[in-house]
């Protein structure tokens, strides 16, 4: 995670040394998630990549869009909040409480997304609202059934997944506020 924070912005700007370091970071991340699995960010990205007629949502882009929302959702589970806060502390993000540290982590991810021109919402990505509404129940059901869902720190059912996707589509969510 520290390597990503250090090198991702420069890598995006075509710095070849930073890109090399990101390759190492990706390798380490791959080794980590081979043992720990991934959670619903990836479940959601798996099921939306090719789901909409407006075009393929690249897996990395989908992960980046979904991550801040999923952290907000997961952080309502105390152990998840503690672990996210620990990540924030380890990478030097501020905050006097775990809640503030988690919010700082979310803000940092959102800052990176803006710097790399990653849309904040599925609507901003270009997914048509009528198609989203037509497909969201099936996508949500499939995402809950994805193998990565079982390793998420907070359980989720299809109805809740649908509400989470709706939050991500519009970017306004009263249901999943910051922890």
Please report, for each region that a protein language model flagged, where it lies by residue.
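Carboxylate- and glycine-rich phosphate/diphosphate-binding segment that chelates Mg2+/Mn2+
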Residues: 1-36
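Glycine-rich phosphate/pyrophosphate-binding beta-alpha loops
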Residues: 31-60
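Short alpha-helical scaffolding segments that buttress acidic/His motifs in well-ordered protein cores
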Residues: 22-30, 44, 67, 109, ...
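Conserved small/polar residues in nucleotide/adenosyl-binding loops
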Residues: 176-179
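Long, compositionally biased
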Residues: 154-169
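Internal helix-turn-beta structural module
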Residues: 123-155
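Gly/Pro-rich interdomain helix-loop hinge
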Residues: 51-54, 60-131
């Amino acid at each position: 995670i520290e390597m990503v924070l250090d090198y991702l912005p420069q890598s995006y700007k075509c710095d070849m040394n930073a890109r090399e370091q990101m390759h190492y970071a990706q390798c380490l991340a791959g080794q980590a998630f081979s043992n720990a699995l991934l959670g619903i960010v990836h479940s959601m990205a798996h099921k939306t990549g090719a789901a909409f007629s407006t075009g393929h949502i690249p897996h990395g882009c989908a992960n980046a869009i979904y991550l801040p929302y999923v952290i907000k959702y997961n952080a309502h589970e105390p152990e998840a909040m503690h672990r996210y806060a620990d990540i924030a502390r380890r990478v030097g993000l501020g905050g006097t409480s775990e809640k503030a540290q988690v919010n700082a982590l979310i803000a940092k991810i959102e800052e990176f997304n803006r710097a790399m021109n990653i849309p904040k919402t599925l609507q901003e990505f270009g997914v048509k609202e009528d198609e989203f509404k037509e497909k969201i129940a099936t996508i949500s059901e499939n995402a809950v059934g994805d193998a990565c869902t079982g390793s998420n720190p907070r359980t989720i059912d299809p109805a809740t997944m649908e509400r989470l996707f709706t939050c991500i589509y519009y970017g306004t969510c009263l249901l999943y506020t910051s922890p």
